[in-house]
Every structure is written in C-alpha cells, then in structure tokens.
Amino acid sequence: MIDLDEKYDLYYYIKISTNKKVWVEEEALYKVVNGKTELAGGEKIFKTKLRTKESGDIQAEYNDKKAGRNPDILCMRVSSVLAQLRTKLPQNTDRDRECLGYIELVLENLKKIFILNPVPSDMRDYVRITDTDLKENCENISAVLRHLCEDSEKKKELLKIVSDLPENEIKDIGFITTQLDDVIFALREKYINSSELFDAKKLSDGTLRCIAIVAAILTIPEGSTLVIEEIDNGIHASRVQALIKNLSLLGEKRKIDIILTTHNPVLLNGYKKQQLLGVSVVYRENEKGTSKFIPFVDIRNYPQVFVRGGLGEAMLDESLLNLIKCPSEKKDYSWMEDF
C-alpha cells in the first residue's frame, strides 16, 4: 500500500510460485480510496490473467479507460510484471502517462526497502573510505560511520543510543586510517578514572550489530522501509527494549517504517497493547507448506493470548499457532479492555 495523495492509495500485490519454478503467478496494481485494504471498488491499473502452469509468458490486462475490451500486454513470468510495464506500457494518451506515473511511484517505493542483516565477523576489518553506501551485511560499516559522523547531529544520535548498551560508558567514536585511505572505526570507553580506545576488531557482536542498525536508520533516505532480521540477536535482553524504543523514535523522526523479526519469547512478552497493533505472525500453512502473514489483531480470539501469559508464551506452547489454524467460535473479551 503506497500513499498517492490525500484521497487515494496505490494497492500493489504479487504472488510468486516457488514449487518447480520461481515465477509470477499473479500480479496487480489498483488505485483505492485512502485507507481501504480491499480491492472491491478500486480502479484497476493492471492485473495479470490466469495462464497454464507450463507457460513462460503471462498476459497483463491494462486498463486504458477506452471503450471496448482492455488491451493485453505480454510479459515474461520470470520477473516482475510491474518492472516490465515500465518500458512496455504505451505512451500515447494522458491515461497512459498517468498509469506510468503510478508504476514509477511503486517501483520507487520498492527500491526504498532496505534489508539489514549485520554480520559482525565481516565488520571487523579496514574498508575503503569512499565505500559509504551501507551494504546488507554491513561489512563497510567503518566507512559509513566515518561519513555519518561528519554530521554532528547524527553523530550525537548514534552515541546516545549506543551508550545505552555496554556496561562501560562510551564517550566518543573515532577512526583509524591508513596511508592507502582504508579506515576502521573505534569506540572510546570510559572506566572509573580513565578511558581506552577499542577498534572494531575488539568489540562484541552485540555492540557491532547495534551500531550497524542505528547507522542504517540514520543514513538511509527518509521515507524508506528498514527490515531488520532478528533484532535481538547478540544484544543483551535487558537492552533490546531500549533499542527498539530508540529506533521507533528515530524512525518517526525520519519517516522510516521499521520491520523487525524475532523469535524471542521474552521480547514478545514485553510488548504492550498498543505495540501489538503492529505485530504480524508468520506461520506455515498446511496445504502447500508456504509461509503466510497474519496481523496479530486479525487472529480470532487473540485476547486468549493474554490470558495464557503473553505473546511469547503463546508462541512457545503453540497455542498461538492453534488459534490461527484451528479458530474456534469468537468470544466476547470486551471486559479485558479495562486492563
């Protein structure tokens, strides 16, 4: 779902087969009334047609708003139809150019999705100073941080969040450079009456992951979406909630949507009622064995989770999975709203 203007959104979806071949099963783009999550009543921009499973091509029906039958555009199934229509869509009318604008907007938003999976072992080495675009595994974190710290406000934000993690107080961040213009970052930690500089080679996995996560949210373009795999991995349980809170504040400030994944029951048990509105559960469905997402609040009788002790406990004893796969008759839990 992408904001178009004050009245309308763009609703894009794609269904991909991963059985014998990886290719497009279904794909569509609609213009819908702002806030609606259903396609009924929406304006079709394009939608693929059903094809035989063996065909390597797929037809996309394009709504040109002309009298008669909508034209079909032939596309390959091995890549996104959306990306192909960028060059295959006709450019003869205002309607054509309007729809191309919608497609460009969706593609632009998809490009702003940044998946972060920091690998601490790859972050403990010198890198080229000019390598300042953060990579998925964060191997070039030292160059990214050096560039980031040229902005005093961003450096201040970074140190404020990172200082909450280790036992020793972090006073500053520094950089060691070579004659060949390679760089490695270091943290200055304060002890009782002294301080010491520790380069990335000596820092813990948790500290490196935290620094990478904060650096990402401070450097990616505003309006982006940041996906962080296993947010709590390597970070002490007592610090994770503080990190998530700080990330949430930073994300709101920079208009960045943050998607976190976790399997940590302790972290999930600590989620408050308002936070659960943003939680989705990923599970494997029985028929095809594929993974599906469902918003937590869309699970029938989800308040039972709180009766049992919390979201984390429900995940451990599989009662959460049972609520999804074997929903019982909906019960009245309005009495819980007072808690």
Regions found by a protein language model. Name each.
Residues 8-12, 196-198, 291-294:
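Short beta-strand segments
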Residues 8-160, 164, 168:
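Electropositive, glycine-dotted interaction segments
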Residues 15-21, 44-46, 202-206, 296-301:
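A short, sequence-level motif marking secondary-structure junctions
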Residues 223-225, 257:
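Residue-level preference for the first positions of well-ordered beta-strands
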Residues 1-4:
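Conserved nucleotide-sensing/catalytic segment adjacent to the nucleotide-binding pocket
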Residues 140, 163, 167, 171-218, ...:
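Conserved ABC ATPase signature
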Residues 242-339:
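C-terminal lobe/lid and adjacent interdomain/linker elements of RecA-like ASCE P-loop ATPase modules
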Residues 16-20, 177, 283-286:
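Short, low-complexity Ser/Thr-rich regulatory SLiMs
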